[in-house]
Regions:
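Charged catalytic cores and adjacent phosphate/nucleic-acid-binding surfaces used
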Residues: 48, 100-173
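Extended substrate/RNA-proximal surfaces in nucleic-acid metabolism proteins
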Residues: 1-122
Length: 173
């Protein structure tokens, strides 16, 4: 209805963000084709079944250990499901680390990140440049600029920009 109502003023598009998990791949394979989505973002919102925003994920681990686990699990998630357009906020787990970006750089996790990027590129997937990292006090958006550069070096071509706006005041943040 909105597309029709505002067709002379703006182009209304429909998208969805899916929390990728291997056990949901079959369900998503049936869900996505049922709707006329213009954009499907595939994101990782849990690591070993725990939300990265939860302190529980970091208990007894260094930030670097959690970041590595997240990249490894993200790779497994995208290997099980390919019916999305871009991967959302690839390194957003850094927002929640005890030391944030102090235990994080592309070079520290190059093997894991490169494997992820190659998998995305092989299947024609893009990356979302998610501005929320800045909103959460990081000196960069997600993913880190070095990851975007590496994505391009490996042949990646698709980058979208998002605000991670869960509330109206966060749109176009």
């Amino acid at each position: 209805r909105l597309r029709e109502q505002y067709r002379d003023q703006i182009e209304v598009r429909i998208g969805v963000e899916l929390g990728l998990r291997p056990h949901l791949a079959e369900y998503y394979s049936r869900f996505v084709p049922k709707y006329p989505f213009d954009m499907v973002i595939g994101s990782v919102h849990s690591v070993h079944g725990v939300d990265p925003a939860s302190e529980k994920l970091f208990e007894g681990k260094t930030d670097a250990q959690v970041y590595r686990m997240t990249f490894e699990e993200s790779l497994e998630d995208i290997r099980h499901f390919h019916d999305f357009d871009v991967m959302g906020h690839l390194d957003y787990v850094v927002r929640y680390g005890k030391n944030k970006e102090k235990e994080y750089s592309y070079k520290m996790f190059a093997d894991e990140i490169d494997a992820l990027l190659r998998e995305l590129i092989e299947h024609g997937k893009g990356l979302e440049l998610n501005m929320a990292g800045l909103k959460y006090g990081l000196p960069f958006a997600h993913p880190h600029p070095d990851i975007l550069k590496r994505y391009r070096e490996l042949g990646g071509e698709i980058v979208t920009v998002g605000a991670d706006g869960h509330r109206p005041e966060h749109i176009a943040w």
